[in-house]
């Protein structure tokens, strides 16, 4: 939303007309044929905001002819969905930074791309490396 203001749209127009904002990224799925369990490094998990105690084992693709030895086959989306609440509207009108808006939205329950990616890692759909490659660190 701050991008619209940066492009010259008046804040009152953005605040009154935008209902929600969606961000998505496509991440590669682990190949089901060559999928194997492994014990991840604690640091790589904590960098993504995943408690290492909750993920004693994860999955990765070993590579096979079915996935052309990449370890991945197919894609899925990770999402971030911001509902424009009255508080967010006030922040837009006050020209608050996108970092501040995002931080407050997370405190109110919004899930970031990284959080959704972490769920997909724990479900064995994708890898730590893939989510790290496609998302920014939640630095707020």
Please provide the spans of the model-predicted regions:
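Short, flexible helix-loop junctions that flank or precede catalytic/ligand sites
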Residues: 1-140
